[in-house]
UniProtKB/Swiss-Prot annotation:
One of its GO terms (cellular component) is chloroplast. Disulfide bonds: none annotated. This is Maturase K. Usually encoded in the trnK tRNA gene intron. Probably assists in splicing its own and other chloroplast group II introns. It is found in: Plastid, Chloroplast. Keywords: Chloroplast, mRNA processing, Plastid, RNA-binding, tRNA processing. One of its GO terms (molecular function) is RNA binding. It comes from Lactoris fernandeziana. GO terms for biological process: mRNA processing; RNA splicing; tRNA processing. Its main location: plastid. The gene is matK. Belongs to the intron maturase 2 family. MatK subfamily.
Amino acid sequence: MEELQSYLKIDRSRQKHFLYPLLFQEYIYALTHDHGLNGSIFYESIENLGYDKKSSSLIVKRLIIRMHQQNFLILFVNDFRQNQNNKNLDSQIISDAFAVIVEIPFSLQLVSCLEDKKIAKYQNLRSIHSIFPFLEDKLTHLNYVLNILIPYPIHLEILVQTLRRWIQDAPSLHLLRFFLHESGNSNSFISPKKSISFFSNGNFRFFLFLYNSHVYECESLFVFLRKQCSYLRSISSGAFLERTYFYGKIEYLVIVLCNDFQRALCLFKDPFMHYVRYRGKSILASKATYLMIKKWKYHLVNLWQCHFHFWSQPGRIHIDQLYNHSLHFMGYLSSVRITPSVVRSKMLDNSYLIDNSIRKFETVVPIISLICSLAKAKFCNGSGHPISKPARSDSSDSDIIDRFGRICINLSHYYSGSSKKRSLYRIKYILRLSCARTLARKHKSTVRTFLKRFGSFFLEEFFTEAEEVLSLIFPRTPFSSHRFHKDWIWYLDIIRIHDLANHE
């Protein structure tokens, strides 16, 4: 109990980060617009901010000189409020630099975590495809899964209180509160759509930092459980700022029950508990009974509401049985299929029939959701019939084909792990015919006339590139086509879901 209380309390060693003086350092502004930084999230060019590379250094120096003035902060606040569209150059520069500065405590934690664990190569762990082999190995032995949505909405002031665990100096917290309340509303809540709306025109990196700190707070319970009960040396669970996902194996689970009167510590033994998260959705799979997994559901809701003050409706956590429901996660429909088999065993003069069931993890393409995404992008209608997209008059045929080809290849790579490729072939057909109709519309002709004139060979190159890559990896055999149709292929260089595949 004492260890848990010490973990949940403010860590004094992490508070000694005085970040406000860094606003007066010129190299911070250089780091803000350095596109070569490893792990950088912000890619906005400085030309879009209204100043070029030659004059940016001079502008920053003049800004730092004005910041040393006694009444600069008052003038800065007044200028910011007068420019509601955030067009003031000083405000934009300071907000960009502040987003980099507040990431420093989390970045230091990530570096120290990697150095302590002596992990030389951890880039492959960032591939979101690497989580599916883990699910294939673990979910086939489990019974229930909790589909969890990260609690939203959250009040702006709660974000400031959360960051007090990491930032000690009061000026940084006041500046953080100022940016939050001026970007949105002083009495508003942050929700996914609203946050993107008022941060998309400003500093999107700032929003990503706030989101990661919010998720970090929600998952602090799982971090504590893994540190106390799990010792997997081959798995890194560093800071969530640079992590795409986080999972851990827990043998003995500890849960904190928070209420208005007391805090009780209860122990649940479950050697098969696994946690996976991507963006705002996470899953908690277990081999426990339905009663135990239902207790976990209400424990999480009570923990978020009583300790972290996150209002989370019970409907945002669903309990599904793996054998009866498909798991919609990371753009795939995953399920555990049970295949019955009968084995005849003979001993002396007696023979026996043994019924065995083989559990197999399957991932398929959610064809209906993917067609809806293609329809929103104007590649087809709601029924899946390909339509032409309006093409610019100055776009060449090769540019149009290349644009369609990149979309097709990206979708083929991401859904290469599907156990059923027939749905993927339908998506390729929609993109192929939509490309042909777009070119025919540009040349003011019909698809049939256009294909007769130019032939269909120019559309086949980018649709068959993925198969050519696979032929270089795997040797050709008489059954190679059947093998490509059945094999699951996971790539270790995919760090994000394609926009068309992200239909959750």
